[in-house]
Curated annotation (Swiss-Prot):
Active site, UniProt feature: D287 (proton donor)
UniProt xrefs under Pfam families: UbiD, UbiD_C, UbiD_N
Key words, A-Z: Cell membrane, Decarboxylase, Flavoprotein, FMN, Lyase, Manganese, Membrane, Metal-binding, Ubiquinone biosynthesis
Gene3D superfamilies: Single helix bin, UbiD C-terminal domain-like
Cofactor(s) named in the record: prenylated FMN; Mn(2+)
The organism of origin for this protein: Chromohalobacter salexigens (strain ATCC BAA-138 / DSM 3043 / CIP 106854 / NCIMB 13768 / 1H11)
Keyword Methyltransferase: no
Gene that this polypeptide is encoded by: ubiD
Record-linked HAMAP family: UbiD
Name of the protein this chain belongs to: 3-octaprenyl-4-hydroxybenzoate carboxy-lyase
Amino acid sequence: MKYRDLRDFIAALEARGELTRVTAEVDPYLEITEICDRTLRAGGPALLFENVKGHAMPLLGNLFGTPERVALGMGQDSTAALREVGELLAFLKEPEPPKGFRDAWEKLPIFKQAMSMGPKTLRKAPCQEVILEGDDVDLDRLPIQHCWPGDVAPLVTWSLVVTKGPNKTRQNLGIYRQQKLGKNRLIMRWLSHRGGALDFQEWQSAHPGEPFPVAVALGADPATILGAVTPVPDNLSEYAFAGLLRGSRTELVKCGHADLEVPASSEIVLEGYIYPDDTAPEGPYGDHTGYYNEVETFPVFTVERITHRRDPIYHSTYTGRPPDEPAILGLALNEVFVPILRKQFPEIVDFYLPPEGCSYRMAVVTMKKQYPGHAKRVMMGVWSFLRQFMYTKFVIVLDDDVDARNWEDVIWAITTRMDPARDTVMVENTPIDYLDFASPTAGLGSKMGLDATTKWAGETQREWGTPIVMDEAVKRRVDERWGEYGIATPPPPPRHSPPSDERGHDDV
């Protein structure tokens, strides 16, 4: 199912029993965070808080609190169907030349659809039904969450930040948190390598002393929101990808203050500028690591115009120790990443980002090993192929007889197939998340690769053990006769068996 806007998605979730309207008064200071956190951990519904203390505007939380709702937001019926999204992205990222006329004819609709999904600009838009300027600009109108006791101030989240570099033909769409400083001032926390920060740096070089235009869209349609966090190929804009997910072109409208365009169906839009040398210390804030981050200085965004729909809905979230909403997003996007990685590395069988690893700091990969040293090639590929894994600190590579998503399997393979000195790869002075205070230098640290695959000739001098596997006929007989044994507990599943084509080093 496709959704025109956020309200369409809310209605669909409510019809499925996936959204609860909370009519009791709730406090945006800490209470909403605790409610959303408990609900998310229980796999509960999206929450529409209709009576937020001190505010007339409702707040939407826990929208993407389950992988299934992420899939629905991307227009898919199940998380398994997200593999199809990944296959589409893999094809668009590196399209293969057609093998013949018939192949070219079959691929033509995909290209035509992708090329026809560029956004279209409207003259009037729902997000501009109400316009506030001058003294009417007041961020206190928004029920901005104060998420954790140690947070310095309320924090704007789920904001789609729209920027455009002076030499760019296409806008950048990024999600950056913003600390509330006053009625019209927010701190724009973007790291130096992110698209918005790069646009700002280019603007400062090309237009020194001039204010940098910025727009922030809150409450866009789910396809546009999720398009901003998906590894979209560089030759495809986030808006075009959102159109592919939605099945219709993304509708935009021009801002009143700057040459920027925002999603027309957004609930709320903030327009303004970053003025030269206007910075402020940001934080501390509770973050996805489960810790409060350090205080750092970032540019200040001055809001000069607020537009919104009639009766707008404020979309919000929180971040904390996993599981949180970003961790759930990462879990769902696992399915998108697999086909993209397999396009470059066909030997990869599965790829998993454990949510307890802060969604991206650890990756578990299973592969069909084909030669000595193959596992090390794959781990290097994970670090280098997609920029989303630039901050991944640990990569564990396993044979395909191991379930990457089962820690019992993974730990068994690590402890039985690894020699720490031989099979550990350490890489120093690599890019690391600035929020990772475990690294010795902010933004720079080390990475570890663990080769937990079966070792082949050339990797070991020893005879490699043969895995213990029960006879299949015996397992079937026990399944059939379990009720005769008089054992009260239900039969456990049989032990996982390695594939029949698994080869040890003696088979080389």
